């Protein structure tokens, strides 16, 4: 294993909430546990960590800078502001792909048998990392899939310029969303590596080790062997 010096790491975590009206919003089942575990693991290795998180009930890990956001637009703005200072960026958040076109200023009343909402695409935060954000460091994405796990993850890796995609099958019971455990596939440009189901805490440390090895191969001076 390469011996590492402190580097600057950005981790995103949790869901986003896209408001419909003052009392309702669109969200997803992400608990944020994997992202928070990664932030903890990076900090444990002595790195300087910024955690950008959507709404969760989790405690912020020690020795981690923390920014809380609500919406995909807010997360996009925070990431765009800070990513240029980072050596590593890990996008573990489950960011909404769509948001209501119009946020109603008052609570929508129950009228009629159906309600139609117009949704519009949110900005692609991971897809913006290389361009237009101009990030040149080690880039890691996450892929939560229900089918074609490796194929979909590899497609994301190529399209978004990632060095690594951490993929998991969220259709499997007992792992992934809401769980303290996960089963992942690390997808690299030339190969993949499967990890059996275990705690997100343990997986986070394994993922961090993998990221440190990737960064060393990118000839980052802060990740050279001592």
Q: Residues of each region from the PLM?
A:
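A cross-family phosphate/adenosyl-ligand binding-site feature
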Residues: 1-226
